[in-house]
Swiss-Prot record:
This is Adenine phosphoribosyltransferase. The gene is apt. It is an enzyme of class 2 (transferase). Keywords: Cytoplasm, Glycosyltransferase, Purine salvage, Transferase. The keyword Glycosyltransferase applies. The keyword Phosphoprotein does not apply.
Amino acid sequence: MESATTDIRDSIGSIPDYPKPGIIFRDITPLLQNPDAFRLTINTLKQRYAGQGITQIAAVEARGFIFGSALAYAMGCGVTLLRKPGKLPGKVTRQNYELEYGSDELQMHENALTENDRVLIVDDLLATGGTVVAASQLIKSSGADVVEAAFVVSLPELGGEDKLQQAGVACYTLCQF
């Protein structure tokens, strides 16, 4: 497993001074362009969650859609999209959350999940954790069970893992920067 996570980490790009000076952007594009690295990422996550009765992957907009859809296909379960406002037709359930400078909202279709669902939240990167705490609250409001939140990359210095722990959301990351 350690070898797999090292290979995955090595396939993630680092772009200095993007989107602004002093920031190092962790770019998943090289991982996605490398079929071996992408397959390894999905297979590593699949191994972790095999046999846990996951019925739905809750994929967080937008890059979570990539990993969440591939993982759901590999595991034989469904995908529930967690989107920004105005992106889903029909009736939606909403969860507001605070950002550093303002607020935002996640939405999902009103009847996307039931109390019988065991849900894995999937996103590409864990930074501050605010979006995933909101995702967990949104999922739980449907009566579904959140098994864990899974990420390809974590930036521990931004406190996301601590925030998730405080909110009672277990998390797993493949690699840290």
